[in-house]
C-alpha cells in the first residue's frame, strides 16, 4: 500500500477544493493514485449533490451578456447569498451566460451544451460537489436584432455582468452604434428602476387590463358616479395606468422634466442619425417568484446541534 504524504493530500485538496480528511481517505482508497482519487471524490461529491437537489435555491446571481446585436440574461440560483460571493460560482455564472449567447435561451439546450470535456449541467454538478450547495440554472432569455444593438445593465453587480438584477434591451436602428449603445444602456437602467410590464398597452395581458378596468369601474360606482360618466373616467384611469406599466409611456428617469420614454427615444434619433425602434426588453430580478424556506432561530440551532 502506497504511503500517503501530507504533500499528496495538499495537492489533492488544492485540485478539488475538498476537505483534508476526505482527500486523505480518497488517496488511501485508491493506493495513492491522484487521478483515481479525483474520480473517487467526484463520485462522492456527485452523490452529495444529489441529496442537496431538494433544497430551495433562491439566492444566486443574474448574469447579463451582450455581443453587438444579441444579448442574453440568465438566473443561476444557489441556497445562500454567501455562495453568490464565491469566485467559482461567479465564474460558473459568466460561463453559462457565454454559452447561452451561443446556443440561445432554451434552458435544456444550455444545460446540454458542451463545456470542455463535460456539459453545462456537468459543470453545475461539479460546483455543487465542490461548494456544497444546491445550484440550478433557473431561466434564460435572449434578444436579437438584425441591425442595431442589444444593450445590458446589471444592478448590484458583484463582478462585471453579474449581480442581483439584469436587464437587456434591444434597439433596432441603422444609426451610429456607439450612440445607440449608450442610449440602450440608459434604457436598460430605466427598465431596472421602473420595472415596466410591457413595451406598450398592446403588449399587456388582456386579463390584467380587464381586471384593472373592472376595479376602477366598481370603485366609481361605489362613489355614486353616474354610469354614463364611468366609462370616460375609467378610460382616463387606464391612461394613467399605462403610464405606470408601459415602457414607452413611462416618465424617463434620465429626463428631469419627466418626458415619456417613447418621446426621449424619438428625440435621440437626431443624435443617432436614424430611426430607432425598441424591439423588446427583459428584466430579471434575483429570486422573484421563488418561495424561500424559513425557519426560526431555535430550530436552526437544534438542526446544527443534531437535536430534534
Swiss-Prot record:
Annotated region (Involved in Mg(2+) ion dislocation from EF-Tu), positions in chain: 80-83
CDD domains linked to this entry: UBA_EF-Ts (cd14275)
A cellular-component GO term for this protein: cytoplasm
Highest taxon above the source species: Bacteria
Sample GO molecular function, one term: translation elongation factor activity
Keywords for this protein: Cytoplasm, Elongation factor, Protein biosynthesis
Record-linked InterPro entries: EF-Ts_dimer_sf, Transl_elong_EFTs/EF1B, Transl_elong_EFTs/EF1B_dimer, Transl_elong_Ts_CS, UBA-like_sf
SUPFAM superfamilies the record matches: Elongation factor Ts (EF-Ts), dimerisation domain (SSF54713), UBA-like (SSF46934)
HAMAP family named among the record's database cross-references: EF_Ts
Function: Associates with the EF-Tu.GDP complex and induces the exchange of GDP to GTP. It remains bound to the aminoacyl-tRNA.EF-Tu.GTP complex up to the GTP hydrolysis stage on the ribosome.
Annotated PANTHER family: ELONGATION FACTOR TS, ELONGATION FACTOR TS, MITOCHONDRIAL
Family: Belongs to the EF-Ts family.
Designated name of the protein: Elongation factor Ts
Taxonomic source organism: Rhodopseudomonas palustris (strain HaA2)
Gene responsible for this protein: tsf
Amino acid at each position: 500500500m502506497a504511503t500517503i504524504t501530507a504533500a499528496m493530500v495538499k495537492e489533492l485538496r488544492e485540485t478539488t477544493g475538498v476537505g483534508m480528511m476526505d482527500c486523505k481517505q480518497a488517496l488511501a482508497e485508491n493506493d495513492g493514485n491522484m487521478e483515481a482519487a479525483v474520480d473517487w471524490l467526484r463520485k462522492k461529491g456527485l452523490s452529495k449533490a444529489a441529496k442537496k437537489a431538494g433544497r430551495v435555491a433562491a439566492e444566486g446571481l443574474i448574469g447579463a451578456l451582450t455581443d453587438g446585436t444579441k444579448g442574453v440574461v440568465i438566473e443561476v440560483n444557489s441556497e445562500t447569498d454567501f455562495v453568490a460571493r464565491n469566485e467559482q460560482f461567479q465564474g460558473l455564472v459568466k460561463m453559462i451566460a457565454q454559452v447561452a449567447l451561443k446556443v440561445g435561451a432554451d434552458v435544456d439546450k444550455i444545460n446540454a451544451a458542451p463545456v470542455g470535456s463535460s456539459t453545462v449541467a456537468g459543470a453545475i454538478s461539479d460546483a455543487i460537489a465542490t461548494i456544497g450547495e444546491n445550484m440550478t440554472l433557473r431561466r434564460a432569455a435572449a434578444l436579437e436584432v438584425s441591425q442595431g444593438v442589444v444593450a445590458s445593465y446589471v444592478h448590484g453587480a458583484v463582478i462585471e455582468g453579474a449581480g442581483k438584477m439584469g436587464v437587456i434591451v434591444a434597439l433596432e436602428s441603422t444609426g451610429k452604434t456607439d450612440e445607440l449603445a449608450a442610449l440602450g444602456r440608459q434604457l436598460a437602467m430605466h427598465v431596472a428602476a421602473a420595472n415596466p410590464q410591457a413595451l406598450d398597452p398592446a403588449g399587456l395581458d388582456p386579463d390584467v387590463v380587464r381586471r384593472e378596468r373592472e376595479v376602477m369601474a366598481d370603485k366609481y360606482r361605489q362613489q355614486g358616479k353616474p354610469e354614463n360618466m364611468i366609462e370616460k373616467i375609467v378610460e382616463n384611469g387606464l391612461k394613467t395606468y399605462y403610464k405606470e406599466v408601459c415602457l414607452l409611456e413611462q416618465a424617463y428617469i434620465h429626463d428631469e422634466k419627466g418626458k415619456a420614454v417613447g418621446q426621449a427615444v424619438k428625440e435621440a434619433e437626431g443624435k443617432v442619425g436614424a430611426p430607432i425602434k425598441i424591439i423588446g426588453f427583459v428584466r430579471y430580478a434575483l429570486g422573484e417568484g421563488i418561495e424561500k424556506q424559513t425557519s426560526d432561530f431555535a430550530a436552526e440551532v437544534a438542526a446544527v446541534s443534531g437535536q430534534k
